[in-house]
Amino acid sequence: MRTLFDNIPLEQMNTSMTINATAPWLLSLYIAVAEEQGADVSKLQGTVQNDIIKEYLSRGTYICPPKPSLRMITDVAAYTREHLPKWNPMNVCSYHLQEAGATPEEELAFALATATAVLDDLKGKVPEEHFPAMVGRISFFVNAGIRFVTEMCKMRAFVELWDEICAERYGVEDPKFRRFRYGVQVNSLGLTEQQPENNVYRILIEMLAVTLSKNARARAVQLPAWNEALGLPRPWDQQWSLRMQQIMAFETDLLEYDDLFDGNPAVDRKVAALKEGARAELAQIDSMGGAVEAIEYMKSRLVDSNAERIMGIEDGGTTVVGVNRYQEAEESPLTAGDEAIMVADKDAEADQLARLATWKDARDDTAVQKALEAVRQAAATGTNIMIPSIEAAKVGVTTGEWGDVVRAAFGQYRAPTGVSKNPSNRTEGLEEIRAQVDAVSDKLGRRLKFLVGKPGLDGHSNGAEQIAARARDCGMDITYEGIRLTPDEIVTAAKAEEAHVVGLSILSGSHIPLIGELMEKMRAEGLGHIPVVVGGIIPEDDADRLRAMGVAKVYTPKDFELNRIMIDLVGLVDAAPLAAE
């Protein structure tokens, strides 16, 4: 943190940190650096995302169980009220909910339920007279998809529902504290690997949803790069997205007019329908005891909604240009050559480990251990975790060490996968594949066993969930234990479950080292006969390397027909040699 903000006066900055499970710690580091600079901490401005509930539902960067994690969220909020009054202690993030398949009604409801869970917990931690101002410091980070009229109506619904909740649930009288403050990144889920140049238009259209309506306009907009379905965007790609915003803001006349949609009956009807659907979901969540108690319910709803979305693309009910219609295309000069995407520096990890070792060698170990014990005691006794965390930051405690302490205090958590063992009601049209699965299962003498795994730290689980759910509906016996598995854990599970095929999902870019390690361990355990398939954001050169390691099939976003993948799996198992006796 000190290196990052070297010669940058934090007292004059407004810093936003997309950090969740370790939000108390990152804010502590920031405060420690600000104090080193001689800053007046009360003048610090910024935001920590600090939304752990969406991590359980969609993004996966959680550490501890929900209840102690909620406690740490409100510890941050209570501390900022007293010491950093200009800081936004939470940015409720519905962006990832839509990326995980949420309908507009679900995005509205799940985000608002998250906000109320936090505010309900915060009530006892701040003086009553200061609570309305704390409500006013809650901000949101939302998504905007291609159906931009519906998305614009969703934003108007967000504004109205939040005002209603603040007034009726929390008794906030000042309209300033009931304002729905939000930033946005438009949808990445809909960006396509096929004809990726079309993504430029998708991104621009999606931006309209959060800019056209003045009364529901985003305070901040960030746009993905056109080639994110291919790999990591280059600086030039990111610049192109920035230019879209600048042209919209400075060349058009959009910002010169009042709201263009006030009084429009079609818009009013859609907003009312979205609010009605969101209220029904909110009532369901409240009946379960709130967002924390309803995590498993919300996760299953997201998996089901995403399955419906994918089936719509597969059966042609939802048109995606270049994917399931208008597939003929000229070769794009934008994707030609080896430098069409950015490749991570292979030496970065070793460099970071070396710098970490140097850092640890230079600090006072006695002071570090004393500080960690203070964090441990705060976690155990319910004292605000921020106070000892700031002291720990000052003596050089690392993020990993802080995380180890809270993990030991509160426990390690595995979130629900949203994929049940029971088939869904979406088996229509799967009869032929189910018959193939039955036939192969008969030959095997037991049900075809498919192990789905997500190795590494990648928490984006949509693909793994949908593959597991479709395989289940096709009649396979599935095992899917969720995210953050080590190669050792996957190999152990493959052996224990006597898997017939292993499927791995990796979207972090670390597919080469992780798959290389896993394939070696599979062979060492006598499991080299089991076919392994891999899916993710995988450039073709890397796909060739994976196949050379022994991977049977490699899938990327262009392989959107899940039934085709299921047929491949059946064929691989049918052709695979039996294990040696």
Q: Where would I find each of the regions flagged by the language model?
A:
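Flexible, glycine-rich loop/tail regions that form catalytic "lids" or insertion modules at the edges
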Residues: R234-P235, S241-Q246, F250-E432, P487, ...
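Cofactor-cradling patches in redox/metallo enzymes
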Residues: A464-V570, D574
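Mobile "lid/hinge" segments at catalytic clefts and subdomain interfaces of large enzymes
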Residues: D51-I53, S69-K125, Y201-L282, M288, ...
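Secondary-structure transition/capping motifs at alpha-helix termini
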Residues: D6-M13, A32-Q45, A78-N88, A117-G136, ...
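Short beta-alpha connecting loops at secondary-structure transitions
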Residues: T15, K54-C64, L97-G101, V142-R147, ...
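Short beta-strand/loop segments at the ligand-binding rim of alpha/beta enzyme cores
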Residues: R178-Y182, R446-K449, E525-V534
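Catalytic alpha/beta active-site cores
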Residues: M1-G145, T150-E151, R169, K176-Q185, ...
